[in-house]
Amino acid sequence: MEKSYSASYAAAGVDITAGYRSVELMKQYVARTMTENCIGGLGGFGGLFVLDCSGMEHPVLISGTDGVGTKLRIAMLLDKHDTIGIDCVAMCVNDVICAGAKPLVFLDYIACGKNIPEKIAEIVKGVAEGCVQAGCSLVGGETAEHPGMMPEDEYDLAGFTVGVVDKAKILDNSTMQAGDVTIALPSTGVHSNGFSLVRKIFDIDNHPEVLQKTFDGMDKPLGEALLAPTKIYVKPVLAVMDELTVKGVSHITGGGFYENIPRSLKKGCAARIAKADVRTPALFDVMQREGGISEHDMFNTFNMGVGMVLTVAPEDADKAIAILKAHGEDAYRLGTIVEGDGVELV
């Protein structure tokens, strides 16, 4: 009996029917992100989106792509996959709002050793939730089965977003000056950076049971705290931009304070921050203690409880914080801009 092509493909480790099943299961989640600007549905060769630039004189598209990194290992060890997609969206959309852009569309890419439809659907459920939080549409994606290249129970996740901003409203730090105020938007935890170090600190790969331990000072098990999804700041930050002049926005990711805050600073300006004013969650204290990590390395690796930093004129600081609080952000004054370069932690 002659084998069909699909049967041969299945014998090679790629289950096409599982792919079809995954798509059917994820449709209900993707539907939550659809708007009147979306044309068609899943299954096309490309995602179609009507670009509405009314009110903009010179619309500029801005794109961003990122992944979740080795935080995925925590999700795999805990067998919890319904929030990791939020992280993927957050890592992309939080970057594009640093230029003042509103995210419009999102696409995801999942590579897996074996397509388990229920697991893939759970991942996409998180991606869709992230898109809802960011106000963008999930217009497409790809799930690639990689037999022989990845273990069956492993996967990788990455995403891509496109946003739009009027050219005249692209964030410009040209007016930044000494005396301006930096505002902190709290993180939910480690977010999606530094997990290779986190795994080493707790020897998670060799002792995954540590994820069930609640350390002194923490109110939840380590695994739950580490897997808390990255916060999406799109709506509160755009709300501030709608009413005030924002001079700089920094998404605090890999490289912590020292690498990311300077990316939004004007040349000749430094961000002075009192370490005592940084509201650092207990999780970071536990990591520093358990890993014997220096304070400098902590601020040079992790967000230390601050997921995003905005810079505004001093007369706008109170109003900016009020707007952020109205959108659910427990924002606070982080520090000030002074003459110099980089970040000064005092």
State what each model feature region is:
Residues 2-12, 28, 119-137, 150-157, ...:
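Glycine-/charge-enriched secondary-structure boundary and capping motifs
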Residues 20:
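Glycine-enriched loop-and-adjacent helix/strand subsegments that border the catalytic/binding cleft
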Residues 23, 121-124, 195:
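Hydrophobic face of alpha-helices
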Residues 100-102, 197, 245, 330:
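Short loop/turn motifs at secondary-structure junctions
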Residues 55-56, 68-71, 166-169, 190-192, ...:
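Short, acidic Gly/Pro/Ser/Thr-rich loop/turn segments
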Residues 28-188:
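Glycine-rich phosphate/pyrophosphate-binding loop regions near the starts of catalytic domains
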